[in-house]
Swiss-Prot record:
Protein name (database record): Protein YpjB
InterPro entries according to UniProt: DUF5508
Biased amino acid composition, Low complexity: 245-263
Coiled coil location: none
Acidic residues: compositionally biased ranges: 233-244
Annotated region (Disordered), positions in chain: 233-263
Amino acid sequence: MESRNSYENKIDEISSLSESKEHPIDIQEKKDAFVNEFKGVLFDKNTRSSELLFNFYECCYKFLPRAQPQDKIDSYNSALQAFSIFCSSTLTHNNIGFDFKLFPEVKLSGEHLETVFKYKNGDDVREIAKINITLQKEEGGLYNLRGLDFKGCFFSGQNFSNYDIQYVNWGTSLFDVDTPCIFNAPAYNKSNEKSLKPVSENGLSGVLTDRNNKIKLITGVAPFDDILFMDDDFDDSSSEDDPVENSPVVTSPVVSSSKSSFQ
């Protein structure tokens, strides 16, 4: 395999170019380079996975940079959805086992929202893609996260105090308990029931939300009293009384959290 530094340099180059509409990216070339890099690791006989990776790269480096400001959030959500579809195909159709993890990590800094899509296998952590969007500021001074679909994302040490999170979809997100996030407590939020049962599953350590407005898996303690979980379009038929240890494993990418950001 190519060295980690060399591979990440490629991703940085792609990401910087993607911020400009005037620097077209050879998406096919980038897709082929990634497939060759991970041939036999993420890709085996299933060509569908590589096609879905191409679709994901298109969302990141073609459609998102060209989207109008009012369409950025929808375009961002499309990139996350395309990544989730790629991950599902990779896990389902390639005979490569489940030792690796694929996940997007979200980082906030003022008006800047950066999402780094990562591959993790033990201590080997690599970037698959990186996207950035600029958030709009509301009259009340909060940055608008409304409508963002964060399900399947990982958060570590992010401060949401200056962000409007009322209509964020947190379904199947993972929050680091070693470096917890900080949330504001606006009047519209409500407390959520939670089951504080320690869980250790495939090295998972963190707070994993389910898609039915509840916290399903918890190790440690995290500040979730002031979060409103919303995913009204998902119908979870599982019993609310099922013990946590018997809860079904989510199909979205699951990640292992470590201190700070997996580094």
